[in-house]
UniProtKB/Swiss-Prot annotation:
GO cellular component: mitochondrion
Family designation: Belongs to the radical SAM superfamily. Lipoyl synthase family.
Organism: Branchiostoma floridae
E.C. numbers: 2.8.1.8
Keywords: 4Fe-4S, Iron, Iron-sulfur, Metal-binding, Mitochondrion, S-adenosyl-L-methionine, Transferase
Name of this protein: Lipoyl synthase, mitochondrial
Record: residues binding [4Fe-4S] cluster 2: C133, C137, C140
Pathway listed: Protein modification; protein lipoylation via endogenous pathway; protein N(6)-(lipoyl)lysine from octanoyl-[acyl-carrier-protein]: step 2/2
Additional note from the record: This protein may be expected to contain an N-terminal transit peptide but none has been predicted.
Cofactor remark: Binds 2 [4Fe-4S] clusters per subunit. One cluster is coordinated with 3 cysteines and an exchangeable S-adenosyl-L-methionine.
Length: 376
């Protein structure tokens, strides 16, 4: 799966969408944090060991020759609650025959994201074009096949119907790779966006897409579908790409996809993600970030890779929260509009959606003001 959403157990997708207004119970301090942009603390919820224990952790963080696997450090241990909305959301998905990357990628955050809570609305990242991928990335737990079942023509309508029932205002649509389909499924992807916008015009839609085999017409089809954020993940650094991703997923090809989106729709907010802990060096991470900036990428997320099953790539290193904070600062210095970097950060992470939602609303307001001034 080329989009892969920083897949594997790495797809700890944190997709809860928080809504506030005049009647919100959110404290003012938390509202300000979200408006200004998140820090590591904003990305971690549930019961996590005290940060005092992080710096004192004496366990091994790097895999050495002969080691079977690394022990999970304290900063990656948290409670996984299941809220009252969990079963309702799951029932909607089953009724409409839809798949989510939350389930297919065995995301351990599924209970929290789907469950919601007093201050947040449950949501999920919808995975369209089926639950079977034509590619086999070595970090991803989504099932694969050369010839998956045909695309469901009713899926765009069903997707819009499901989302309308959830009452959210920001949704992420991703997909498996469909190399068996002529256009890679770009027209189908586009129809999903159009149906959502037709049913809920105010909905902010982020699409996390495949590379469409480098077919730039297919990329443009999705970019011009009416979405608000175009996301495509490079997943890892250039040197590790042939080892980590499917051979058909090329590092430079992914950069070209992101660049072409900006050429097609210059004002489009673009986004990408990098997994850490696969054996990359600091210089390689920095170079990948620089490559993304040159491609015009606005938003970047970095998070810890975790091995989904014994058949997948082993974790080579558990990156510390301090190091993730360093990369967040580097991202800001490089000029990314938004950099989310932390052990539990995932490419569709909740706090990122807050920030991007504010960015998009600001753009809408500016566009309205420009139109008004021109008319006057």
């Amino acid at each position: 799966m080329a989009t892969c959403l920083l897949m594997s157990t790495f797809t700890f997708i944190r997709c809860s969408v928080l809504k506030w207004g005049s009647g919100s119970s959110l404290p003012q301090e938390q509202k300000e944090k979200i408006t200004k942009g998140p820090g590591l603390g904003d990305f971690i919820s549930g019961e996590v060991e005290s940060t005092d224990s992080w710096e004192d952790y004496m366990g091994k963080l790097r895999l050495e020759k002969g080691d079977k696997r690394l022990r999970l450090p304290p900063w990656l241990k948290k409670e996984i609650p299941i809220g009252k909305n969990y079963h309702s959301l799951k029932g909607t998905l089953r009724e409409l025959n839809l798949a989510t990357v939350c389930e297919e990628a065995k995301c351990p955050n599924i209970g929290e994201c789907w469950g919601g809570g007093e201050d947040k609305t449950a949501t999920a990242t919808i995975m369209v074009m089926g639950d079977t991928c034509t590619r086999g990335c070595r970090f991803c737990s989504v099932k694969t096949a050369r010839s998956p079942p045909p695309l469901d023509p009713n899926e765009p309508v069903h997707t819009a119907e499901a989302i309308s029932r959830w009452g959210v205002d920001y949704i992420v649509i991703t997909s498996v790779d469909r190399d068996d389909v002529a256009d890679g499924g770009s027209a189908h992807f586009s129809e999903c966006v159009k149906e959502i916008k037709k049913r809920i015009p105010s909905m902010l839609v982020e699409c996390l897409t495949p590379d469409f085999r480098g077919d730039m017409e297919a990329v443009a089809t999705v970019a011009q579908s009416g979405l608000d954020v175009f996301a495509h993940n490079i997943e890892t650094v250039k040197r590790l790409t042939p080892f980590v991703r499917d051979p058909r997923a090329k590092y430079d090809q992914s950069l070209q996809v992101l660049s072409h989106v900006k050429k097609t729709v210059p004002d489009m907010v673009t986004k990408s993600s990098i997994m850490l802990g696969l054996g990359e060096t600091d210089q390689e991470v920095r170079t990948a970030m620089e490559d993304l900036r040159r491609a015009g990428v606005d938003c970047l997320t970095l998070g810890q890779y975790m091995q989904p099953t014994k058949r997948h790539l082993k974790v080579q290193e558990y990156v510390t929260p301090t190091k993730f904070k360093h990369w967040e600062e580097v991202g800001g210095e490089m000029g990314f509009a938004y950099t989310a970097s932390g052990p539990l950060v995932r490419s569709s992470y909740r706090a990122g959606e807050f920030y991007i939602k504010n960015l998009l609303n600001k753009k809408r307001t500016e566009a309205t003001l420009d139109t008004s001034s021109q008319e006057s």
